Amino acid sequence: IVYLSLSSSVGGANMNGHSIYTGKHGRGCEFGHMTIVPRGRKCYCNRAGCLDAYCCASILSDFTGGDLHAFFEEVKAGKNKGLINAFDEYMDYLAIAVHNLRMCYDCDVILGGYVGAYMSEHIETFRNKASELNPFEKDASYIKVCHYKTEASAVGAAVYYIDKFVKELGE
């Protein structure tokens, strides 16, 4: 399973069985710094075209004074074409990233973080965008929305220690 966190920055994790992939240098799953647009927007890492520069939460919330909830309420109301177009473009870039993750890992991708908490209402539209990019399958049901809408990383960290504790009880 790949978890893609769409919050103040973009990050993620890859669970393989009961193990989290961290990589050789502890930087595994730095999805926010995958290049999705060569020579694109400047990222806070001083490179250009990183996913973070296209899909962090502030890309959307900046349209509504930093209020992500207000952004999604406006999109839901359907009256502000500028916001609807901005969200459509956001989903286009996100679809590229999710497609790339699917091609690399061939597993489910969970959308989480601040933006992931709002994706339930838009998941079918988003799945359609992602499926258009995939040459092997049209079914994009592998894209999931997080169950925990807030504090997902805290829950994930706790689960690791709870699992470890339960295993120690069995020894």
Predicted regions and their residues:
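Phosphate-binding/catalytic loop of phosphoryl-transfer enzymes
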Residues: 1-46, 162-171
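ATP-binding/phosphotransfer module of carbohydrate and carboxylate kinases, centering on a glycine-rich
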Residues: 47, 51-171
